[in-house]
Each structure stands twice: as structure tokens, then as C-alpha cells.
Amino acid sequence: MGQVKGETGAGAPALKVSGLRYEVADRMLLDGVDLQVRAGESAAVVGPSGSGKSTLLGCVLGLIRPTQGKVEVAGQDVVRMRQRALERHRSRYMGVVFQFGELLPELTPVENVALAALLGGTPSDQAYERAETLLRDLGVPYEGAPTGQLSGGERQRTAVARALINQPAVLLADEPTGALDRATRDSVTELLFDVPKRWGCALVVVTHDFEVADRADRCLELTAAALVPRKAGDRS
């Protein structure tokens, strides 16, 4: 796929979160959160339900406006962007994988993946060519059967391909293995954490599964509204 868009020079972070603060109904979910992830690097964020993990991803995506702080993706602060500019920036520089894939079941895998590129303005022939290449690389049968007939692992691989089709600077994954059996979880986990090295983007995985989190280059825990380092293998 080549060099990802949004690279800002050697060593520059693809994602930089600075002093992020968010509270709702007098409850502090994020209090001065900092996070930097560089191209080719992975970070996992763990924490109990309700700790603010998905809120953090929402702030990175620009779906939630923090009380204060900055979220720089590919060198630009999404917090201060107007809606239309934010949507363009998100489409160009961010890819997302959710727990249940969020794919259209009636479309084939190649149609699902190409659709994301078409919505981003890629010409049809290029969109389908890139979609087929990605799905082939990720081991997904892309012709014939609709996506709804694929196995859980194949659907998640299709979701990863869709997230990568626009060559994002940052790939975000929210509980991407939560609905999978153990064997399929391990396969999808291996695929996900291979993405930064193969495609050159930054990867942030939010998960409650410590075995998944341990595969990341860095593991952090969101606790008491703060993001703190966590040692690999620590289950306490």
C-alpha cells in the first residue's frame, strides 16, 4: 500500500493526545490524558467497563468534544475543526474497526471495502482494485457470497481491510475481538498487530482482554480518569 498519508517526518507521532479532559454529569472520565503513538507502533488501552476507553476513542475520532485538551491526528488538531473539515480529515487519516464489524451484510466483502474508498472520492476502478488487493492480502474470499454469510473471523478481517482502504495514518480498534471465539480471536489479534509494520500506520486498540493487549508495543490502563503504563502480563 506504500507510505501512509499524514506522515509528518521521521519520529513524529501519527497520533498525539495532550491534556485531554472530559466530564459528564459531574463525573470525570478523562483527566489530563496524554498519549502518543507513532507510525508503525501499536498501543493497547485496557480498563473496566465505564472507565472511559470508548470515550477516549470518541474524542480521537472527533465524535465527542473534550472539555479541554488537544487531539492531533496527522499533525492537525481535530478538536478545533469544524464539522465538514473534521469529516474530511477523518476519512483521509483515520480507520476504525468495531466489535461487530459494522459491515453491510448484503454486500460482498469487496463491495463493503470498496465502498469506503468510493465515499472518500477514489475512482471506482481504483477502489475495487485496492479492495481486492487488501482482501487477498488478508486472506478473505472477496467474490460471490455476501458478507453476512462469512465467519466471524472473516468479517473482522473484512472490517480491517475496509479500515485500511484509504491508507490511514491512524487505525483505531474498539473491542475488535470481543465477539469472537478464542481461536478466531487469536487469528484476528495476530492480524491487527501486524498492521503497523505492514502498512505503516499507528494502531490503538481498546480492549478488556489482557491477552490481546499484551500483543501491543505498549499497554496502558485507563483508571481513575488517568492513562497509566501497564506491564505486560499484569492482571491485577
Regions found by a protein language model. Name each.
Residues 61:
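Helix-to-loop junction immediately C-terminal to a conserved catalytic motif
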Residues 167:
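Conserved catalytic motifs of ABC-family nucleotide-binding domains
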Residues 134-148:
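Conserved ABC nucleotide-binding domain
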Residues 107-115:
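Short coil-to-helix segment of the ABC ATPase nucleotide-binding domain corresponding to the Q-loop/switch region
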